[in-house]
Amino acid sequence: MKKIAIIGVGQLGSRHLQALTTVKQAIALELVEPYEPMQKIAMERYEQMPKNELIHSITFFDDITALSNELDLVIVATTANVRRTVVDTLLDTKKVKNIILEKVLFQNYEDYDHFTNRFAELNINVWVNHPRRLFSFYDQFLSDLKNSSQVSYHVQGGEWGMACNALHFLDHLQMMQSEDKPTIQIDTTMLMTEVVESKRKGCYEVYGTLNGTIGNGSFSLTCTKGEIIPTTISIMSDDVRIIVDEYKGIAMFAKRDNEWKWENYEDKIVSFQSELTGIVADDILTHQICKLPTYLDAAIVHKPFIQKIQEKIETTLGKDFGLCPIS
């Protein structure tokens, strides 16, 4: 029987828990969550799902050190400000085979190399939860996008949390590259000169337009301030054009080999986290692979992103945080 742990079962962690009710192999679930209200919410969400007889047990712990000594998969769903401490404690006290981390990976640039070395030394497989890689809608276009000489990727919307969520879009563009280690450039000059505190204590949000390149792809991410406006994603390449409103579940596409005639896509576009983690867990536990980006691949984008956003926030506020205050 496999042992899966989730560290932090708050808003996102509880969705991972829900998704694990779909696993297709025998597991024991171990959950680290010191706050009883969060434990209650997590169990309420867990019990909303169909019962799975393959889940032999579910146990809550207040501390990482109380987990089983050997774990097949650990999902770290904490906020970024405590993630280094959490992961170091996990690696110091337990033998772990596989890990899934949330974004933003770490707030300190130095932490990325620290864990690159630690994961390699301990021979641990690590992935980062950028779930658009699991949306089957985009799979049908990947071959065309990866074979294109250039890809143009645009996101527009209001109050979608650029500092918090831009990495999901950048990873999406990275997925469309044929290179394993594409060169990345990020330009923050079109961001607004205003930085505001986010809902998470000690974290900030930015607005305006973030431009740059990833490999042969260019991107432009725009987030306006004030009104929540659903995001639209526009992707253009040599052979395909795609326009998506994920919030409304609407998409159109046109392909060169169909004379650029626009077609409506009428199937499901977005999958929720509560629908995805079970699939990922089964892939990892059975094959030691999954469709999420590896830690090393994700770090290629995360490192320059937190550098640029940290510079923007510190310059705007006239403060030296010594880290990138986003999560």
What are these regions (language model features)?
Residues 26, 46, 73-75, 282-327:
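C-terminal helix-rich "cap/oligomerization" subdomain common to oxidoreductases
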Residues 1-52:
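N-terminal Rossmann-like dinucleotide-binding module
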Residues 203, 214-281, 290-296:
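NAD(P)-dinucleotide binding in Rossmann-like oxidoreductases
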Residues 49-59, 122-124:
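A short helix-to-beta-strand connector/capping loop
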Residues 136-152:
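Rossmann-like NAD(P)H-binding beta-loop-alpha module
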Residues 54-70:
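Short acidic low-complexity segments
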Residues 71-76, 80, 84-131:
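Beta-strand-loop-alpha-helix segment that lines the small-molecule cofactor/substrate pocket
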